[in-house]
């Protein structure tokens, strides 16, 4: 499966950001996404987490998920692409992501 395909799926990038923030159990990720308005079903979240593990972007240790080095680098690239997009046009970046980037990039 292509990494672009996985990253383009609903909720995937938001899941990576939540794990980066230390929200790392299945339930806490689900609750955090729901609170941010990016709710995904329990089934979809399980699928995304499995896909992210398959792509080696995250790893599971017991009941906790953590970013791998590859996952950290992927988020850096995603942030740079969003900054670039915002620079060249009025981007429609999800609010959850804008909050994670901070005002300095807008």
Curated annotation (Swiss-Prot):
Molecular function terms from GO: DNA binding; DNA-binding transcription factor activity
GO CC annotation terms, alphabetical: protein-DNA complex
Keyword Transcription set for record: yes
PROSITE patterns per record: HTH_HXLR
Keywords: DNA-binding, Transcription, Transcription regulation
InterPro entries, A to Z: HTH_HxlR, WH-like_DNA-bd_sf, WH_DNA-bd_sf
GO biological process: regulation of DNA-templated transcription
SUPFAM superfamilies noted in UniProt: Winged helix' DNA-binding domain (SSF46785)
Domain HTH hxlR-type: 1-93
Domain of life: Archaea
Protein name: Uncharacterized HTH-type transcriptional regulator MJ0925
Species this chain originates from: Methanocaldococcus jannaschii (strain ATCC 43067 / DSM 2661 / JAL-1 / JCM 10045 / NBRC 100440) (Methanococcus jannaschii)
């Amino acid at each position: 499966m292509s990494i672009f395909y996985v990253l383009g799926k609903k909720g995937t990038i938001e899941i990576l950001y939540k794990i980066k923030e230390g929200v790392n159990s299945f339930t806490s990720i689900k609750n955090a996404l729901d609170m941010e308005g990016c709710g995904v079903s329990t089934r979809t979240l399980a699928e995304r987490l499995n896909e992210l593990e398959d792509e080696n972007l995250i790893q599971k240790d017991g009941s906790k998920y953590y970013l791998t080095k590859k996952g950290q680098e992927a988020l850096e690239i995603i942030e740079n692409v969003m900054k670039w997009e915002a620079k060249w046009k009025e981007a429609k970046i999800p609010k959850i992501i804008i909050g994670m980037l901070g005002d300095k990039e807008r």
